[in-house]
Amino acid sequence: MSSLNLSAGPEPVSERPDDAAAIEAETRLRNDIRLLGRILGDTVREQEGQSVFDLVENIRQTSIRFHRDDDKTARAELAAILDGMSIQDTMRIVRAFSYFSHLANIAEDQNNIRQMRAGSTAGSAPRAGLLAKTLAHARQEGISAAELRKFFATALVSPVLTAHPTEVRRKSTMDREMQIAGLLDQRDRVQLTADEWTDNEERLRRAVETLWKTNLLRRTKLTVLDEVTNGLSFYDYTFLREVPRLHSALEDRLADAAKAEGANAEGELASFLRMGSWIGGDRDGNPFVTAEVLHGTLKLQSTRVLRYYLEELHELGSELSLASHLAGTTDTVKALAETSPDTSPHRKYEPYRLAVSGIYARLAATALKLEVENLRAPVGEAEPYASAQDFKADLDAIHLSLTTHHSGVIARGRLRQLRRAIDCFGFHLASLDMRQNSAVHERTIGELMDAARPGTSYAVLDEDARIALLISELRSTRPLTSMFVKYSDETVGELAVFREAAKAHATYGAAAIPQCIISMTKGVSDLLELAVLLKEVGLIDPSGRSAINVVPLFETIEDLQACAKIMDRLLSIPEYRRLVDSRGSVQEVMLGYSDSNKDGGFVTSGWELYKAEIGLIEIFEHHGVRLRLFHGRGGSVGRGGGPSYDAIVAQPGGAVNGQIRITEQGEIITSKYSNVEVGRNNLEILAAATLEASLLQPKRVAPHRDYLEAMEQLSALAFKAYRGLVYETDGFVDYFWASTVINEISTLNIGSRPASRKKTRAIEDLRAIPWVFSWAQCRLMLPGWYGFGSAVSAWVTEHPEKGIAFLQAMYQEWPFFRTLLSNMDMVLSKSSIGIASRYAELVEDTAIRDRIFSRIRAEWHSSIDYLLAIMQQDHLLQSNPLLERSIRHRFPYLDPLNHVQVQLLREHRTHDPDEQVLRGVQLTINGISAGLRNSG
């Protein structure tokens, strides 16, 4: 065998004979996988020997037989092979299959980029999900360029990066993989000579060998500031350049559209795409996010953006070599030039360069004031900028001077992008949300109230009494805290964080921390408690002015059902309504997909979220307040994941209304934004979907009443089935902890936050992320489908006159139901009941194992059967051939990792603790996560 069959891949996917583009894309993808697989195979043979190479191939072939045919002989052979391996060989096997998953992902991403480029060539029809297509749709609907500009003037599209621990890759690994991606891209884009082709492959070999010799796992646990630093790397990769470019491209498209309409494009497009972050501000369940960490986070963010501005100013100064006698200047630019510290006689007659050097000096002084260290070049004394707006005003003056003096083309280059970047990123880079659990706010307020008003006993007050007390405190001008009272460590820590937030507003501007989120919001008092705490540090004024948004997060099924009533009562309180009005009469509400799914299952969670939005829309319209929804979606379908475009346009009419915030979590950040072209595409998808859902979706017919009624019935039936298994079946907790890697996940150094809220085994206390992540690892993906089959079966039995035909029509005509089922199709395609059966064998109590797994297996088959019947498909992913091909390419190399993981789990749990065995389990978790791509 000359090369590892990692390069062979599955059998070619059959395409229609006339689908030449698809066939070519498939061929090129297979070629890339073959190339990387061959290089990896050579590396394994050279570094580990022929015997390890042969062992990898033997396991791969046996695993394919087991997966394809549920071959019992293959199952026994696989067990024998794995039993006979040393721990050293096991680690090598795991690393080989893990790295193949990583390399296959790179090849797949490159193929997606290739297809994006093919669809963006001159003369090609715009693709769905991109702005060109949405703008064309708007024109067809008679929406003018001026109306679109007006829409974007008040629009907000905000991806919010979070540090949820589902990204298991180290940055060292990601950097090397980006190098490999760049080399593949070079083979696509550049006409290489024979020598260059050879050099390219040699560099690929070096990169793969370096990967092979790099630790896949972190040796130490991440700190919060480590997570912040990791998150900031995506600004270098994508956001700092692509956010301004997206605005410029859209601005140009609208200008062209206005010209075609015979109108003038007035002014610049408003900045609507703004980055957000939870990393360093999310305290819910994370005791390591303190006032000091908040300060450090903001400093790191500011350092990153100021260094970028300084680098761009340096380049801009090099570019603007315009001589004064060849290019005119305004008096403002002349004044800027006169303040420049640059005294070189060579630049005496280059006013634009002098102006930029003066701006550079002021920005460098600003950076020093904001504690930025290791500046690129020392400068003379200069006055720091008071704000990012003042900095931009100087660049605006240069822009005006250039355009006034016939140099508009020059103004549209680096200067245009830098001005837009300042508008989007300010001196703070990303808007940092603060988040804390309502129970913590309640304890803090209770302690403060009881000290300030002896005899209050806040903890035992009912909701009405709490509301009355909190309203009176909001009106009060006296402080609630006292320097003469010794408070608990928790209260001292909470107040310190709020005071640090107030300092951040003074230092970086209000955009640095614009939101404060209350997780597990259950009543009006939860929001008023936070408002009182913010008033205590000056972020809210007793007169009714607020410098920050108070945002409820509704997470459980019960809370989603109550959220409209809660917000109705809240907005009816004059003291709170004044705060909302001071924020432009906009109230943000966050909806949690993760906990609602863990609480009620996939079907019920999706439906209750949809109904909650409808209820909120009606209440907010009644109060005359603009609703902005913040969607707390995870990477996996079980936590609200799935294609962003489909999810946004499937929202009920009026839910988006020009403004949306959406979390980007864990491994999804890497897959969406580590590559600049993929990142640009994903940012554009968010903008296009927001426009589509806001301006074009309301023209659609509302869902048929019969569909709403059927969905309510299906949800109730699915809820009963899901709760019946997860919360009401004796032994289920034992089954879950024994048949998944939930115990072992906590040993991974992939995040700063604990996996459970409390130190119990109860499902209620487990965080949604490890819950979903664990089911993904054992390939059941249970949170993404369980209960659907039972629900449809019961519904069809109860409604024989409607039957499956009614649900088929519902799927075809209702975007919400179609998106729900499409996401289920995706998650079921990644599941494997055969592999899951091997994890079930880890449950020592055979009665519990057989009873529970038989229920899961029956529901899995039932859910697939009914899903295919409703979607009118012969097999899973029939309507998504791109993902089907992806899975067919990658999963023959993913499945062996599951088999090895089961073997290692058994050994880890039945023998004395062995660091190598545990590390082997951790490596399999890494590899499986990479292969699944959206596992948490």
Swiss-Prot record:
Keyword Lyase: yes
GO molecular function: magnesium ion binding; phosphoenolpyruvate carboxylase activity
HAMAP family: PEPcase_type1 (MF_00595)
Function: Forms oxaloacetate, a four-carbon dicarboxylic acid source for the tricarboxylic acid cycle.
InterPro entries for the chain: PEP_COase, PEP_COase_bac/pln-type, PEP_COase_Lys_AS, PEPCASE_His_AS, Pyrv/PenolPyrv_kinase-like_dom
Catalytic activity: oxaloacetate + phosphate = phosphoenolpyruvate + hydrogencarbonate
EC numbers, comma separated: 4.1.1.31
Biological process terms in GO annotation: carbon fixation; oxaloacetate metabolic process; tricarboxylic acid cycle
Active-site residues annotated for this sequence: 164, 598
Gene expressing this chain: ppc
Region span, Disordered: 1-20
Keyword Nucleus in record: no
Protein name: Phosphoenolpyruvate carboxylase
Family: Belongs to the PEPCase type 1 family.
Organism of origin: Rhodopseudomonas palustris (strain ATCC BAA-98 / CGA009)
One term under GO cellular component: cytosol
Cofactor requirement: Mg(2+)
Keywords: Carbon dioxide fixation, Lyase, Magnesium
